[in-house]
Amino acid sequence: MRGIALFVAAVSLIVEGTAESSICSDFGNEFCRNAECEVVPGAEDDFVCKCPRDNMYFNAAEKQCEYKDTCKTRECSYGRCVESNPSKASCVCEASDDLTLQCKIKNDYATDCRNRGGTAKLRTDGFIGATCDCGEWGAMNMTTRNCVPTTCLRPDLTCKDLCEKNLLQRDSRCCQGWNTANCSAAPPADSYCSPGSPKGPDGQCINACKTKEAGFVCKHGCRSTGKAYECTCPSGSTVAEDGITCKSISHTVSCTAEQKQTCRPTEDCRVHKGTVLCECPWNQHLVGDTCISDCVDKKCHEEFMDCGVYMNRQSCYCPWKSRKPGPNVNINECLLNEYYYTVSFTPNISFDSDHCKWYEDRVLEAIRTSIGKEVFKVEILNCTQDIKARLIAEKPLSKHVLRKLQACEHPIGEWCMMYPKLLIKKNSATEIEEENLCDSLLKDQEAAYKGQNKCVKVDNLFWFQCADGYTTTYEMTRGRLRRSVCKAGVSCNENEQSECADKGQIFVYENGKANCQCPPDTKPGEIGCIERTTCNPKEIQECQDKKLECVYKNHKAECECPDDHECYREPAKDSCSEEDNGKCQSSGQRCVIENGKAVCKEKSEATTAATTTTKAKDKDPDPGKSSAAAVSATGLLLLLAATSVTAASL
């Protein structure tokens, strides 16, 4: 029995040891490199990387242990950071008359400033050092090097103002006879001097501008006015209503009620240099007789781009390009190849919603240090209480790092230090979750399809599938984005779509019959669909009819002149032939002439297209390039899907 008990105990230890080390053996040991992987007690799926010394932390981005107290982790509110050795940093200031090496104001300087009527403070103008501050109601006399009161030099104030602010005792040269016990009881007007005209040596009230004392208040000079004086301002600005501060000169004024009548109801009216201007707000444009913020051009969303109205013009922009790390952005296509995640936690400080971006670099450094350099950008979505951050990674994050922020590796009381500089509350971090972009960044694109497409996350793709009542004609793919181009008709259900997808094909409903077909510019292979590399017989015949040679390049068939041959060039058309009309009508479209060629357009667009100028052509993207890129990406995904099916069957 004793032997059996020992055997059972041994097996239990082996099983327990295997369970505890599984996360480390499967992933953690390689992740931690020169640090030691340890399973978090009570959480067998979580691990931490322990460095050989307590004064070190593991930097997952650099794959190495680093010292905790360095200039990388220390913030200097004043002075500069200096590392006395690899494991010790401190904030220091250069030796000076006013500061110590530890950036403290010297006692001698503080005493001297106090004797001159001021308070010694650290400079906040970008320079390192101390300054003798005379306060809001004083100024430094650079001749005597003493603080002088400015309350009686302020023409923008009254004696009642000084009384209510309890400032009467600061300067006896004005407001004689006023009593702070009753600021509403003013003495006779001719018995005291008003602020701006203090009492002089002869007992008379003197304009401070004439005695040059106004220089303590006015930075750019002064001039005498009916209100004692007012400050002058530099070119491009004018004195404000208080007579002291300066404000920029505006050449634009508001419109009168009569002038507003010349504008449309939705336009803003302003007068610039005497001319009445009627304009839409900067984020709207004029469509018909109304200013609207919505885009009316569909080409943006057809290429997976967002459309926005800026400075009264609508334009396409790619929401992914501004988020990418380097110059490897294809300027001709809007691709989504990155992976988006979200995480929330409680920091030791809070910001208002206008300053969330201030925290992004700090959070990015902490995230990369914790889980690795795959994350290249952080966007703070909310920071008013808890921080909600969007993490953008070059590739999918390992499932083993998604709970990494929840393991408090470096506790400090009720807080956890996420090196190098992020302090968060214990147990406040959520698990890192992949973001479903259909519910966030792709909402605008989904809305732009006007109910024809619905955004669905399918495996690795965000797919704008045809909605009920629409059927797929073909598909476009840009990285992780896919869109089914739809037309009114019977749509396939999820089972039919899944059945076709398993074959690497798309569902097509034509002539009352449903079937699976290879996407355009792919062809059936031994398994699934493969990317085309040659012209098909129909394309070859069309080129031969033109005495040209069919060449398949850039994912499309083109008719080219053979080498050393002089070829016939098809003349420009000025009207659609019966064959052209029939071809377009078969797909529910209408034939129009663009740049001498017959093209098929949706009937709703045909009227506009028929009158389109050459300038409109320049604004459209090259359809060859976009479709070629789409087929290339689609072909690659389908080939991978087919390969996966084969592997699974084997």
From Swiss-Prot:
* Residue ranges of domain EGF-like in the record: 20-66, 67-104, 205-247, 251-292, 291-335, 482-530, 531-568
* Glycosylated residue positions: 141, 182, 348, 382
The organism's taxonomy opens as: Eukaryota, Metazoa, Ecdysozoa, Arthropoda, Chelicerata
Signal sequence: where? 1-19
Q: Kindly list the residues that the UniProt entry marks as GPI-anchor amidated serine lipid attachment points.
A: 627
GO CC, alphabetical: plasma membrane; side of membrane
Q: What is this protein called?
A: Glycoprotein antigen BM86
Record localization: Cell membrane
Q: Which cysteines are joined by disulfide bonds?
A: 24-37, 32-49, 51-65, 71-81, 76-91, 93-103, 209-222, 218-231, 233-246, 255-269, 263-278, 280-291, 295-307, 300-316, 318-334, 486-500, 492-516, 518-529, 535-550, 543-559, 561-567
Keywords attached to this Swiss-Prot or TrEMBL record, sorted alphabetically, are: Cell membrane, Disulfide bond, EGF-like domain, Glycoprotein, GPI-anchor, Lipoprotein, Membrane, Repeat, Signal
Q: Which residues form the propeptide?
A: 628-650
- Indicate how the chain sits in the lipid bilayer: Lipid-anchor; GPI-anchor
Q: Does the keyword DNA repair apply?
A: no
Q: What's the domain of life for this entry?
A: Eukaryota
Where is the stretch described as Disordered?
A: 603-628
On whether Cell division is a keyword of this UniProt record, the answer is no
